[in-house]
Amino acid sequence: MKKLVILRGNSGSGKTTVARALQRKIGFNTMLISQDEIRRNMLWVKDGIDTKALPLMIELLKYGNEHSDIVILEGIMYDEWYN
């Protein structure tokens, strides 16, 4: 991974929309990691300090580091929970 772009913000602020548009604009070899996609659709877990989504997000970031030029990580990711 040559670059990591992190988009954080409140619910409904447009993070996912911006992240998808950015991925389309950059194009090839860009990985998008969505906190909600992992938490809600892949794992069906709640967000919180001990969320089971965090270890998978970390593994996906490691994968992106090895295999992608740019990784976009987007989600609410509260400071207290995702330090």
Regions from the language model: what does each represent?
Residues 71-75:
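Short catalytic-loop micro-motif centered on adjacent basic/acidic residues
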Residues 7:
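Hydrophobic anchor at the beta1->P-loop junction of P-loop NTPases
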Residues 13, 17-69:
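Conserved substrate/cofactor phosphate-moiety recognition/catalytic segment
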Residues 48, 76-77:
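Short coil/turn segments at secondary-structure boundaries
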Residues 77-83:
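ATP-dependent NMP and nucleoside kinases share a basic, alpha-helical "lid"
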Residues 10:
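P-loop (Walker A) phosphate-binding loop of NTP-binding proteins
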Residues 1-4, 68-69:
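Pre-Walker A (Motif I) flank of P-loop NTPase domains
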